[in-house]
Curated annotation (Swiss-Prot):
This protein's UniProt keywords: ATP-binding, Cytoplasm, Ligase, Nucleotide-binding
The enzyme's E.C. designation: 6.2.1.54
Residues noted as binding ATP in the record, renumbered to the chain: 152-153, 292-297, 383, 395-398, 494
Binding positions for D-alanine per the UniProt entry: 197, 301, 494
Pfam families referenced in this protein's UniProt entry, alphabetically: AMP-binding, AMP-binding_C
Protein name as catalogued: D-alanine--D-alanyl carrier protein ligase
Membrane-spanning parts: none
Gene source species: Lacticaseibacillus paracasei (strain ATCC 334 / BCRC 17002 / CCUG 31169 / CIP 107868 / KCTC 3260 / NRRL B-441) (Lactobacillus paracasei)
Top-level taxon of origin: Bacteria
Pathway given in the UniProt record: Cell wall biogenesis; lipoteichoic acid biosynthesis
Keyword Nucleotide-binding in record: yes
């Protein structure tokens, strides 16, 4: 257990200064460098930035980003990460909500942002080498102060800034380092972009454990040949990603324990881990433990988890997302907010110390989604789930991914889940096509097919529908299946359902 994220990382630097904190394609940075650079940057930020204001940091998967995050934390500022692969309008959308006084350019901004101080890379590099370090941590982020603010997509297209405090982060990190069996000095893959809160799953637990973050930038992950050549050289103990990214790695027949002898932990979050992906990982990595976790950004990365063993895979066609972390209570409630009985589907409510105070500068949305229970904060997740008597939770889809077709209520993710079990399908995502009255007229599935001997897509579709018909009600079978070489992913590595919906409704 740690009591402060910042001092825990500094302690590693004091005790193991030459340990490698960050490795970017073979360029290594030690904990001593991380401490000295972040201390000097903190001194610089204390002089140049207005006190306690959140600051946008624009950049990619680099050591400089981590150093800037820590420098801001030490000088009392929350950071707002924006990844270089975000669309340009994202920068202005975030700034329109956040009104930050400054943007730190770790990488060059692609557009001009008016009426804001821009701190450019040369000034950062000068400061990290020559500026006087901050003299103490008395103004550092602590307690209920915001540590980071991550923007998620809003339903109106206006993004929502989720405020995560130091105490929220501390609750998450302590659970991660105590419950997942990670060792001091762990070597962890750092693949999710910093603007996606899944990155926090590898970033802070690894640093407080004195481990090494192995950066996997998008330029590598976007090129499968490069990716498959790079991954085995990283010497990983821990893999953190969405299930979709692991499914890409599994396309390489060499992705197995023989070629990754030290890989002992898979941690998944961000989307549903399907049974056949878990089975494939368990088969290929007999020495590793596969953990399924769940949590909205609003509750700090993840709030449930469990090891997915062979017994669990055999027992549950749709895998559980685990049990609530010890300091957190999770309830399943009906539309009136009453707790439902075990096994009954309802909405997940999450109460505990890792629940956010709310959305930055958005009291209306905050009031809708968050509530107080005594001194604890609660969050209405919008996720449907069931819970067993002993507290094991099963995810059942989004309340807002429900559609009605011919009077039947259909969970798109339920259709996806079953379609992904079909023997001819590698990956699939189902979307509604609306008619001119904005009613759902058809379900359309986009799918990546496995290699097959069918003479036409029509014959393949007949076989897919026949197999799917054994798993789901007839009204849940998509009317059309469109085959693709790959499905579009969001910047966060999830299947981009919104892009597919837009495609069939243009």
């Amino acid at each position: 257990m740690i009591d402060n994220v910042i001092t825990a990382i500094d302690r590693v630097a004091a005790e193991h200064p030459t340990r490698v904190a960050y490795d970017y394609e073979g360029t290594q940075y030690t904990y001593a460098q991380l401490k000295e650079g972040s201390d000097r940057l903190a001194g610089f930020f204390a002089e140049t930035l207005p006190e306690h204001e959140p600051i946008i940091v624009y950049g990619g998967q680099t050591f400089d980003m981590v150093e800037v995050f820590l420098g801001l934390s030490k000088s009392g500022h929350a950071y707002i990460p924006i990844d270089t692969h975000s669309p340009n309008e994202r920068i202005t959308q975030v700034q329109d909500v956040a009104h930050t006084p400054a943007i730190i350019e770790v990488a060059p901004l692609p557009i001009a942002v008016p009426d804001v101080q821009i701190i450019r890379a040369p000034a950062l590099h000068e400061a990290e080498k020559t500026h006087a370090p901050i003299s103490s941590l008395q103004h550092a982020v602590v307690g209920d102060d915001n540590y980071y603010i991550i923007f998620t997509s809003g339903t109106t297209g206006k993004p929502k800034g989720v405020q995560i405090s130091h105490d929220n982060l501390l609750s998450y990190v302590n659970w991660n380092i105590s419950d997942f069996g990670l060792k001091e000095g762990v070597v962890a893959m750092s693949q999710p972009p910093y603007s996606f809160d899944l990155s926090v799953m590898d970033l802070y637990p690894t640093l407080v454990l004195g481990g090494t973050l192995k950066a996997l930038p998008k330029e590598v992950t976007d090129n499968f040949k490069t990716l498959f050549a790079t991954l085995p050289k990283l010497g990983l103990n821990e893999w953190v990603s969405t299930p979709s990214f692991a499914e890409i790695a599994l396309l390489d027949p060499n992705f197995n324990q023989d070629n990754y002898p030290d890989l002992t932990h898979f941690l998944f979050c961000g989307e549903e881990l399907v049974n056949k992906t878990a089975q494939e990982l368990i088969t290929r990595f007999p020495k590793a433990t596969v953990y399924n976790t769940y949590g909205p950004t609003e509750t700090t990365v993840a709030v449930t988890g469990m090891a997915i063993t062979q017994d669990i895979v055999d027992q549950y066609p749709r895998l559980p997302i685990g049990f609530a972390k010890p300091d957190t209570e999770i309830f399943v409630v009906d539309e009136q907010g009453n707790q439902v009985s075990a096994g009954t589907e309802g909405e997940l409510m999450i109460v505990g110390p890792s629940v956010s105070k709310g959305y930055l500068n958005n009291p209306e949305k905050t009031a809708k989604a968050f509530f107080n229970v005594g001194s604890q904060r609660g969050y209405r997740s919008g996720d449907l789930a069931t819970m067993t008597e002993d507290g094991m939770i099963f995810y059942r889809g989004r309340t807002d991914f429900q559609v009605k077709l011919h009077g039947y209520r259909i969970e798109l993710e339920d259709v996806d889940h079953n379609l992904n079990q079909v023997s001819y399908i590698k990956q699939a995502s189902t979307v509604p096509r609306y008619n001119k009255d904005h009613k759902v007229a058809q379900l359309i599935a986009f799918a990546v097919a496995k290699p097959n001997d069918f003479e036409s897509d029509m014959k393949l579709t007949q076989a897919v529908k026949a197999e799917l018909g054994k798993m789901v009600m007839e009204y849940m079978i998509p009317q059309r299946i469109i085959y693709r070489d790959k499905l579009p992913l969001t910047a966060n590595g999830k299947v981009d359902r919104k892009a597919l919906i837009a495609e069939v409704n243009h």
